[in-house]
Amino acid sequence: MSESKREHVILIVEDEDAIRLTLRDYLLKKGYTVLVASDGVGAIKQLIDHQVDLIVTDYRMDILGGDYWIKFLDKYCTDQKVLITSGFLRPEFPIPFDVLYKPFDYSDLESMIAERLADTGSS
């Protein structure tokens, strides 16, 4: 396992248990340190308690999801790298972060994560 991956902390924010836990297990096997939250409120707690390198978040969640969650991330997490996953959003929607559309292949997710973590800029 790559030491550089282990040093990266990824926060997965996903309200569907099966998806959240599958993503967690996949990224753990790839060597990342992974935190999870089931909604935006839980994610805020994780962000307060831990240093996070990348947020991988669903767009549509019942509790603090959707446009309010995106606005929160854009306003209060300006130095945070964020990747949105969604089966709901369309390319024409104005989202200030990169979006990976569901259903997606895990290798595409892994590539996008690696690109964001290698990028020295934000978002």
What function would you assign to each model-found segment?
Residues 1-9, 105-123:
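Non-catalytic signal-transmission and effector/linker regions of two-component phosphorelay proteins
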Residues 16-35, 106:
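Two-component/phosphorelay signaling modules centered on CheY-like receiver
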Residues 20, 62-63:
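The feature encodes the CheY-like receiver
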Residues 36-45, 66:
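Helix N-cap/capping motif at the beta->alpha junctions
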Residues 45, 67-78:
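Short amphipathic alpha-helix used as the core "switch/output" element in two-component signaling
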Residues 58:
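Active-site residues of response regulator receiver
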Residues 84-86:
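Hydrophobic/aromatic residues positioned on beta-strands within the core alpha/beta folds
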Residues 102:
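A Lys-centered signature of the CheY-like receiver
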